[in-house]
Amino acid sequence: MIVLDASVMVEVLLNRPSGARLAHRLFDPEEALHAPHLIDLEVAQALRRYQACGEMSPQRAHQALVAFAQMPLERHPHWPFLDRIWELRRNLTAYAAAYVALAEVLHAPLLTCDRALASAPGHRAIIELIEG
């Protein structure tokens, strides 16, 4: 079981080297993938940004969004974790804290490409930094 943040998912969807290295792990049928519902908005926004700046065609961005929607990813509401998200406010954005809180509750590692999130203190999550 692993928790993914949007940075990892975008790396996979864009088929970047770090995403390609993760593919075997993320597409393993024995591996359960989890994320807060927030991931949907963050991935859609990232794809929108890449399309808007010309790094992706509108068609490619849409294909990536469709591929994301088909991922076997169990999404969790973040409202049960609001108190913990608030407790983490000194070191993490509310967005990052949603992923961390979920990883804490599930006792699962959180995969991220976000160096700031990976180095943030004050939580009990196991965070794996995926570097490009």
Language-model features and meaning:
Residues 71-113:
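Active-site neighborhoods of divalent-metal-dependent phosphate/nucleic-acid chemistry enzymes
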Residues 44-72, 84:
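Active-site-proximal, substrate-binding regions of enzyme catalytic domains
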